[in-house]
């Protein structure tokens, strides 16, 4: 589905008329059930549940969030390519601009309040940003495996990604190969591959075959321009300067962190929680224990469902 934002002024001062915003709704129609907004991550999209759903293990009848009892809404981040449109420039928006657009999208749909906003990775940062801009919008927010501000380590990785995109002869494939190393951990890869050789007889290592597979797979389903946009947006995460400023958010805040995350590190999530909880009692901290690093939010579904489910009760 698509709506049009009549007028939008980006933080760089550019004014857009009739800006298209695409989205999907699952479950009961808007206005008839508690509404959950799901913000997608870097290579994600609005298909969060159902036949093409990339988060079905969490958002389904078998998962923690039931689309039978909750209306599920997800927008596409402009430029992610899922609507078939290519972005002319990677740097035209910041993540704050995306949050502003999503809020205008909610206004267009007549949405005054949300039961919850949930998102992981960049989608989690977007969750922080939306709640910061409209502190009373949601009853609950669940930012997963993310940060309210880009760390120097994250900025290091996004610069490497941009350099690969600019200089590689096979930019999308090579950028994805590097990104996979950020999304996993040494312990995860060592345990899985044990320095074994690939099964294809090429003589290469199994881990090399696996990395190339992920690079090739993304090339088939993702636009190079979209990857550039999403990488740029990741580097613009900056809700506020200090965590204490997040106390303006009235929602119950459930921070979910992964103890082995190399991209959005566990210690920073803990520091954010500690800065908040002394001023805001309805702040809670949950840990996913895993050797798999950042991608654990897409792998450790038993733990994630156990963490999230209590806040999404379904009537008997």
Model-derived segments and spans:
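Conserved acidic catalytic loop of the alpha/beta-hydrolase fold
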Residues: 96-115
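Conserved hydrolase catalytic core segment
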Residues: 113-152
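Catalytic-loop region of hydrolases
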Residues: 1-35
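Conserved alpha/beta-hydrolase "acid-adjacent" motif
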Residues: 262-271
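N-terminal cap/lid subdomain of alpha/beta-hydrolase-fold enzymes
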Residues: 24-82
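Short beta-strand/loop motif that positions the catalytic acidic residue
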Residues: 249, 255-257
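Alpha/beta-hydrolase-fold enzymes
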Residues: 137-217
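Catalytic active-site module of serine/aspartate enzymes centered on a nucleophile-bearing elbow/loop
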Residues: 270-316
């Amino acid at each position: 589905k698509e709506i049009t934002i009549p007028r939008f002024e980006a933080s760089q001062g550019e004014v857009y008329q009739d800006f298209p915003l695409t989205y999907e709704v699952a479950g009961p129609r808007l206005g008839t059930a508690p509404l959950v907004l799901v913000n997608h991550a870097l290579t994600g999209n609005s298909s969060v549940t159902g036949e093409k759903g990339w988060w079905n293990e969490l958002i389904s009848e078998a998962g923690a969030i039931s689309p039978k009892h909750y209306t599920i809404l997800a927008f596409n981040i402009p430029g992610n390519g899922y609507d078939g449109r290519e972005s002319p420039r990677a740097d035209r928006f910041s993540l704050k601009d995306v949050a502003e657009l999503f809020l205008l999208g909610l206004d267009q749909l007549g949405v005054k309040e949300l039961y919850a906003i949930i998102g992981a990775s960049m989608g989690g940062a977007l969750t922080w940003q939306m709640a910061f801009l409209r502190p009373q919008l949601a009853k609950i927010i669940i930012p997963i495996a993310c940060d309210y501000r880009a760390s120097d380590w994250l900025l290091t990785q996004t610069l490497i990604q941009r350099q690969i995109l600019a200089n590689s002869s096979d930019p999308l494939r090579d950028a994805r190969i590097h990104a996979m190393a950020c999304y996993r951990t040494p312990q995860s890869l060592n345990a899985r591959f044990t320095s074994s050789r690939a099964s294809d007889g090429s003589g290469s290592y199994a881990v090399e075959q696996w990395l190339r597979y992920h690079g090739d797979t993304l090339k088939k389903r993702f636009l190079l321009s979209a990857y550039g946009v999403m990488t740029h947006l990741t580097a613009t995460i900056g809700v506020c300067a200090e965590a204490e400023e997040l106390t303006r958010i009235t929602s119950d805040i459930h921070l979910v962190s992964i103890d082995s995350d190399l991209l959005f590190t566990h210690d920073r999530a803990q520091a954010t929680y500690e800065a908040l909880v002394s001023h805001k009692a309805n702040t809670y901290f949950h840990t996913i224990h895993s050797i798999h690093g950042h991608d654990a939010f897409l792998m450790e579904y038993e733990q994630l469902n156990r963490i999230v489910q209590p806040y999404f009760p379904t009537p008997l």
